[in-house]
Every structure is written in C-alpha cells, then in structure tokens.
C-alpha cells in the first residue's frame, strides 16, 4: 500500500470519527432548524443541558485519545511490521507507552473538567 493511500485512509478515518461524534452528540438533528445560526454546544449551555455537554466532552476526549494512540503506536507498528520489523520488541515500548499515556490523560482531563463544571454549577 502506498504512502498516499495510507494518508487517504487515515484522513478518511479522521473525518469519519468527527462525523460520528457530531452525529451522536447532536440531539437537535431531526428537529426543525432555528432561524438563527447557533452552535449546538452554546444551545445546550444556555438551556442547561449539562449532561449532553459532558457526553460530547467524553466522546471528544475518547476519539482524541484513540487518535493519539493510533498515530504514535498502531500506525507506525503496522507500517514497520509490513516491512519485516519485530514490532513487539522493547524498541516500540516508548511509542506504546506514549500512546496509552495520551489516551489516559485525555480521558482524565474530561473527568476533571466535568467535576470542575459540576462544582462550579452547584456553587452558583
């Protein structure tokens, strides 16, 4: 598989994951469109639909974490495996650890932001 085709597949995957996140987070998709253009997240914040905002944050951070893991470990190891390298060696451990670290930090950030927002809302 050529590098151009790999790039196309990765780019298509990014667009597809963004579309999935937008489609699953939009509760107003099938309702009558408003006359004023507004961002969905602003609509939800104004109407105090905090749980839906948190769902969007979780989805965003999970997708970002998976992309970090993919670009730091999965994609390079597939490429190197096809060229005959041993991708389960110790040399690839830092890449795997960095990818897992990025995923965990992204998810922890969304949990921390959710807790902070709940505390801020309850405080008044």
From Swiss-Prot:
Membrane topology reported for the UniProt record: Multi-pass membrane protein
TM annotation in the entry: 7-29, 56-78, 91-113
GO CC entries: plasma membrane
Domain of life according to the entry: Archaea
Keywords in alphabetical order: Cell membrane, Membrane, Transmembrane, Transmembrane helix
Subcellular location: Cell membrane
Name of the protein this chain belongs to: Uncharacterized protein AF_1757
Species this protein is from: Archaeoglobus fulgidus (strain ATCC 49558 / DSM 4304 / JCM 9628 / NBRC 100126 / VC-16)
Phylogenetic lineage: Archaea, Methanobacteriati, Methanobacteriota, Archaeoglobi, Archaeoglobales
């Amino acid at each position: 598989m050529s590098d151009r085709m790999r790039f196309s597949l990765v780019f298509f995957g990014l667009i597809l994951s963004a579309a999935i996140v937008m489609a699953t987070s939009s509760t107003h998709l099938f309702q009558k469109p408003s006359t004023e253009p507004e961002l969905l997240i602003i609509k939800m914040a104004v109407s105090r639909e905090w749980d839906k905002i948190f769902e969007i944050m979780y989805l965003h951070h999970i997708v970002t974490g998976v992309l970090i893991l993919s670009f730091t470990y999965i994609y390079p190891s597939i490429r190197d495996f096809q060229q005959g390298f041993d991708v389960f060696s110790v040399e690839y451990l830092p890449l795997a650890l960095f990818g897992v670290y990025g995923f965990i930090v992204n998810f922890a950030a969304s949990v921390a932001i959710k807790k902070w927002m709940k505390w801020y809302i309850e405080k008044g």
